[in-house]
C-alpha cells in the first residue's frame, strides 16, 4: 500500500480489530494512522504505533445520518495522539474546511457525552415533543412543521447570546401554576413527563428562574 495516511472510519468496537488486521500487511514505519471515534483515544491504534506508525484520533463535532452529506466547513475536530500524527491531522482538517483543536485522552468520554447531548439526545427530545403534540391533538407531521420556527429561533438565540439569556417560558418567569398544569396533563404521556421533570430540574440548577423554591416543591410533588 502506497498511502502514507490511513484513516480508520469504522464503528468504535471495530477500530482495534481493523488495526490488528492491517498490522502485518503494511510496513508502518513512517506512516500515519488515524481513527474517527469521539469516545475512544488514539491508544486503539497502539498495535500500529508499536510497528512504527504515528497515531491520532480525529473526531468532528457533527451529525451524520444515512443519505446526508453535511458540509464540514467550520466544523470543529477534536484531535489527540502523537505529535507528528496531530500535525498531519490538523492539515487534513484544514483541507476539509474544518478547525482542529487539541483534547486530552482523559477527556474524550466526557467530550463524546457532550456531543451526544448536542445532537442524538436533542433528537430524542424532539421525538418526545411529538408525543406531547399528539396529546394536544397535533399529528407528528404537523408538529414538526409547526415546531420548526421556534426551534430555529431557539438555536439562533443560543448561538447569539448563550443559554441563560436565551432561556424563556414558564420556569424563568417562576410560573408555578403553569408548570403544575403541565405536569398534570403529562400524566397521560408518562415518558414525556419524566423528561419534563428532569429538564425542569436542570433548568432550576443551571439557568435563571424566579420562584425557584416554589418550583422545586411543585416538581417534588410530581415525582417521575
Regions found by a protein language model. Give the residues of each.
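Rossmann-like NAD(P)(H) cofactor-binding subdomain of soluble oxidoreductases
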Residues: 1-68
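Conserved active-site and cofactor/substrate-binding residues in soluble primary-metabolism enzymes
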Residues: 10-13, 84, 120, 124, ...
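Alpha-helical elements of the RecA-like P-loop NTPase motor core of helicases
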Residues: 16-20, 87, 180
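Hydrophobic, well-ordered beta-alpha structural blocks that scaffold small-molecule cofactor pockets
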Residues: 18, 219-220
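Glycine-rich beta-alpha junction loops
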Residues: 37-41, 62, 83, 107, ...
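Internal alpha-helical scaffold of NAD(P)-dependent oxidoreductase catalytic cores
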Residues: 48, 52, 69-160, 214
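N-terminal first-folded block
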Residues: 129, 220-223
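Interdomain hinge/lid region at the active-site interface
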Residues: 156-214, 222
